[in-house]
């Protein structure tokens, strides 16, 4: 995988600045704008997987189609993060229950601390696993346009198992891209965040596509 190109490929498009500008502005539209941007990122991912020299699609084309794909991509992401949401809910529920059934304040504090610590560690592990699986789920949907492909966990775990090293690298680089977007966007008077985060999403699309192309041959 060419990690460096995941940041540079965007500027290889002659109209990259216009696409990043418009993408950032569209993301300001509540709900609809964010879903469209997700659909745009998905189409970029599809183009990366297909090996197109200039993967960035045109901004504004097939608005409805990208909107629907963005919604479905949101559904995929929501389902994958559902276990993490449930763990967080269980962690929060424990505090009032223990406060109600235990009279000793010190004991309550200790029990809640252990409870929260255990769920915190478990949530961290689950979050990392989800972060490692998501590139393959997104990519399978992007390549096939079939929602069910994103939930073929046997194939997805097989890809991850045979490409655990590259998957970890993608997870780390993706996190760094998000951090860089936050720092640079904040420096640009805050408003720059909408453009730097959109840029970071396009970096994610390339990373996911490159990882998926590397992993495809490992699953029949």
Show which residues each predicted segment covers.
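Small-residue hotspots
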Residues: 23, 84-87, 91-95, 116, ...
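Interfacial aromatic "cap" segments that immediately flank transmembrane helices
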Residues: 2-27, 59-86, 133-183, 210-220
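Membrane-interface segments at the starts/ends of alpha-helical transmembrane spans
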Residues: 17-18, 22, 106-120
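Selected alpha-helical membrane-embedding segments in polytopic membrane proteins
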Residues: 32-93, 97
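Short helix-capping/hinge motifs at transmembrane helix termini and TM-loop junctions
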Residues: 92-95, 99, 103, 143, ...
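Selective recognition of hydrophobic, aromatic-rich stretches within alpha-helical transmembrane segments
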Residues: 27-50, 111-150, 182-219
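Membrane-interface interhelical connector segments
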Residues: 99-112, 151
